[in-house]
Amino acid sequence: MQFCWIGLQIEAKNAGAVVLRRGFSTKICMSRRRKCALRILETYPSADYTKKPLFFAVFWLRMQHISDRIEQISVLQAGLNETRRLFMQKSFGFDTLQLHAGWRGDSATGAHAVPLYQTSAYLFDSAQDAASQFTGELPGSIYTRIANPTVSVLEERICALENGRATVCFSSGMAALLAAVLTFCEQGDEVIALSSLYGGSFALLFGQLEHRYGIRAVKIDSEDLTGLAEAISEKTRMIYFESVSNPLASIADIEAIVTTAHENGVPVVCDNTFGTPYLFDAAANGVDFTLHSTTKYISGNGTSIGGCVTDLGTFEVSGSPRFPQFNLPDAAHHDRVYADLGGGAFAARMRDYFLHDAGFCMSPFNAFLTLLGLQTLSMRMRRHVENADAVANFLADSPYVEQVNYARLPESPYF
């Protein structure tokens, strides 16, 4: 014989309907709780359940299936914990990660798909709990401008695919680029960028950055890196390039860029939008940070705008003379010293300044749509490559075409 405590608080009885405020101690479906409440009504029909204080009934109920349900939930939770442990070890392949990373299921409902948490704010257990989360002492969702459960799943999933340390999502790829630059740079600092870039990125770096923010962008020829080492100065805060440039599809000498940058203590930031984590493993090639316009291949369905920046865990700002903003107390954010956060320094500062303060946040709905597209990334990229091969070879054989820029053609300098 097994028993289970059921707690029921009845708010109203109207034409046989029962409204329950709260059930506790077990994870029993609402229909089961409603049946229990009706049994109380049948036992005490004369009680007035509508007056305050609300009637509170606790009783013993012999129900074998409830105990079985609790046991099932315990097994499910153990399985979810094991899944989380395996994902943290990154022991799964790319296809599995793009489907499951960042989401362990909903233990409260049993839902296996990622829900759309379309909410602006969240509930707190107490005023102290809210204060601790707002100051960053405790983790949690406090406001969707800063963090949202749906967006967080997308961040964790992209981070797993990039084999990174932390990812922050933004409202667009351009917002992600500006956030990355302004996280590393203060007025008077410099950014080195290769010349072959997406038009919007080129306009921001070489047309707006110095004029509006006092940050100088130094341009280096993508096809000739001989001037890269000489261009690095005490003011240099990052070197920026695209893994596969948009739209010329040129490929820089990544090994030379990484070697030169690290010899001078400068982080390497790669726009991996065209390469994607599937075609280009930035971490394995020495890159320190990646960014994406998730609008393009990450999403793949043309329905959502977004961007992200991922810290790949290879560059440390602690004690670096190039980055005093990470090593000094930040009066604007509770005197936080970001370097003290270790591996979370870059993501935390970016989230504080560009989500909390500036509102560059990705909407939950865009994150939800992006997650749907991300599930097929590997299959889509394989087909993209097959299609691009066919088109490039067709054009290369055409007497009406003078030049084809495609790295997989034998005559390409990047082949």
Residue ranges and their predicted role:
Residues 90, 98-107, 167-397, 405, ...:
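Conserved PLP-enzyme active-site core in the AAT-like
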